[in-house]
Amino acid sequence: GTPILHREKFSSADGLGHFFGIEYRPPAEVADEEYPFTLMTGRLLFHYHTRTQTGRAKILHHEVPEAYVQINTEDAARLNIKNGEKIRLRSRRGEAEAIARVTDEVGPGVLMMTMHFSGKGSVNQLTNTALDPMSKMPELKHSAVAVEKITEVQ
């Protein structure tokens, strides 16, 4: 073995790398009237997986102490959601709660929720279990959800 694979050539008969395109397949679940947002899961710089290690580091916990959801500025305004408010996401599989981060880093109709938290902040309560037929990877980047602001009365 070598520290870097394929530095001089690939391990194919002709020494070249071969790429193959695949036919586009739409996601198993798309946004609709009841669940109008597309949810993506995402990682953070400050935490690793479910925080079994990074969650105990005070400085890392201080940076991101709880789950958050990035929501587009236009969507937040339409739903009267302010930055830092608690929101609830609902899918066909469950619900989760997190802090809203209003931003233009995600497009309209798209939400990004951190994947590192458990309990009410667990994005896995929402994600679609459909598997890609080729890779067998779950569609964690494409789940239809609804969003609502959590009020004191609820």
Language-model segments: residues:
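Long, low-complexity segments enriched in small/aliphatic residues
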Residues: 1-59
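Long, contiguous, secondary-structure-rich segments that constitute the structural scaffold
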Residues: 34, 50, 54-70, 74-154
